[in-house]
């Protein structure tokens, strides 16, 4: 077995693997620079049988001074910062942003996010692998 970097000659094999899995997502654009790691595993016969594809995404953090202004003012400030942040992320080439809400604020703050166009995504079960302590 051999693990190596992806090359364009792997594309058809990866498309076939993707189709055979029958998952509900489009085949990704592997030329997108947000794919920062593309590893292929070949079997002993030299066939591409596995691929690990890592695309950068964005995890959002929001820090708020709860004593600064009244709720209406804080919401207005959040709207302004949200729009500026969205433009900034797009300018940097990002395609999506994710927010993991603490359970105690998820329902209420989730409604605020939805008012800005965010969608709750429970369709897939997220897992996390910490790479550093």
Residue ranges and their predicted role:
Residues 58-116, 121-122:
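Acyl-donor binding region in acyl/amide transferases
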Residues 122-133:
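C-terminal "cap" of GNAT-fold acetyltransferases
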Residues 5, 16-28:
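Helix-loop element at the rim of GNAT/NAT acetyltransferase active sites that forms part
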Residues 1-14:
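A short beta-loop-alpha structural element at the N-terminal edge
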Residues 30, 101, 125-126:
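Proline- and acidic/polar-enriched loop/turn elements at helix boundaries
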Residues 3-5, 25, 117-123:
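Short secondary-structure junctions
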Residues 31-73, 131-133:
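Conserved donor-binding loop and adjoining core beta-sheet/short helix segment
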């Amino acid at each position: 077995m051999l693990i190596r970097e992806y090359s364009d000659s792997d594309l058809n094999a990866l498309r076939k693997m993707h189709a055979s899995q029958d998952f509900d997502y489009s085949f990704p654009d592997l030329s997108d620079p947000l794919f920062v790691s593309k590893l292929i595993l070949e079997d002993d016969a030299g066939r591409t049988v596995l691929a690990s594809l890592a695309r950068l995404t964005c995890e959002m953090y929001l820090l708020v001074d709860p004593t600064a202004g009244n709720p209406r003012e804080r919401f207005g400030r959040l709207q302004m910062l949200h729009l500026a942040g969205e433009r900034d992320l797009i300018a940097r080439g990002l395609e999506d942003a994710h927010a993991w809400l603490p359970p105690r604020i998820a329902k209420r703050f989730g409604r605020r996010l939805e008012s800005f166009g965010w969608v709750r995504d429970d369709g897939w079960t997220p897992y996390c692998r910490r790479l550093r302590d």
